[in-house]
A protein has these predicted regions:
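Short alpha-helical interface elements
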Residues: 1, 50-57, 195-200
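Single conserved hydrophobic/aromatic residue that forms the stacking wall/gate
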Residues: 1-12
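Long, contiguous internal "core" modules enriched in hydrophobic/ aromatic residues
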Residues: 13-160, 164-180
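C-terminal structured interaction module
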Residues: 168-200
Length: 200
């Protein structure tokens, strides 16, 4: 009887492990497909690259691994931090290297010197509210520093100082998600849609 119950317990544990792996893979697939909603938008050059899905996936992996409070979470946080910095760099360069200008937005060539005499609308509209959001450069830089410090630097420092200390994990997760909040806000606020050229 004991052997039967032990065998049944082993089978149950294997099934739980298998279900866990399947759910993990489905979660990653969901995150990837969500990220591709943004990555496939050619009208938003800062999103239109393969760093976008990589950033989404490692955001999830790094955040989830914090509960482990071990070196695996440090590695994932480090990869996430590098991807985030690269994403910001590419976002800053995105319109410089794109064949997009006021001319192409209006159907002319990039080299045409096109200037609007007046704004397209007298009042704000949906496109201006959703696609043309301006963030002052000095504020964006400050928010990036806050995001980077809270999402990567502090969590990594606390994990190194208190490895395996589960009570610290709540604090680490809280700090990390503050950084993620600012990072995600910038992801949308700094995105420059091609339609912005039409509105100068």
């Amino acid at each position: 009887t004991h052997e039967c119950s032990s065998a049944a317990s082993d089978v149950y544990k294997r099934q739980i492990d298998e279900v866990g792996i399947i759910l993990f893979l489905l979660s990653l697939f969901t995150i990837f497909t969500t990220s591709m909603i943004y990555a496939q938008l050619k009208t938003v050059p800062s999103w239109n690259n393969m760093l976008t899905p990589a950033l989404f996936i490692f955001t999830a992996l790094a955040g989830g691994s914090i509960l482990l409070l071990d070196y695996a979470s440090l590695v994932l946080l480090l990869i996430f931090g590098v991807l985030q910095v690269l994403f910001w760099y590419i976002a800053d360069q995105s319109f410089i290297h794109k064949e997009t200008s006021v001319g192409t937005a209006l159907g002319f060539s990039k080299n045409e010197d096109i200037r609007a005499f007046d704004v397209a609308h007298t009042n704000r509209n949906y496109l201006l509210n959703e696609m043309v959001y301006k963030v002052a450069r000095k504020h964006a830089i400050k928010i990036r520093y806050i995001s980077f410090f809270a999402a990567f630097v502090l969590p990594m420092a606390l994990i190194l100082m208190f490895p395996g200390n589960f009570s610290i994990s709540v604090l680490v997760i809280g700090i990390h998600f503050v950084g993620i909040y600012f990072s995600r806000w910038l992801f949308f606020a700094e995105a420059k849609h091609s339609v912005s050229f039409y509105y100068n």
